[in-house]
Amino acid sequence: MFRLKQLREERKISQVKLAMDLGMDQSCVSRYEAETRKADYDTLIAIADYFDVSIDYLLGRTDNPKINH
């Protein structure tokens, strides 16, 4: 995911902590950051909600992190 590592590092969250909070293995987080694994829609929602950003921002499709309602 385009901005996952950036968001995680800005908030000083380890891959292990993020993985635990989201109920996944650390290796999944690592692969998402390296873009060697694609997240399913439910995972994208969970990660975007965790960082309080839109999925479009997470994927680099917009520079606006806010969720538009």
Q: Which residues are covered by each model-predicted region?
A:
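Short, charged recognition helix plus adjacent turn
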Residues: 10, 59-69
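Short alpha-helical DNA-recognition segment
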Residues: 13-31
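Alpha-helical residues within the helix-turn-helix
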Residues: 9, 20, 49
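A short, Lys/Arg-rich alpha-helix, primarily the initiator
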Residues: 1-10
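DNA major-groove recognition helix of helix-turn-helix/homeodomain DNA-binding modules
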Residues: 23, 42-57
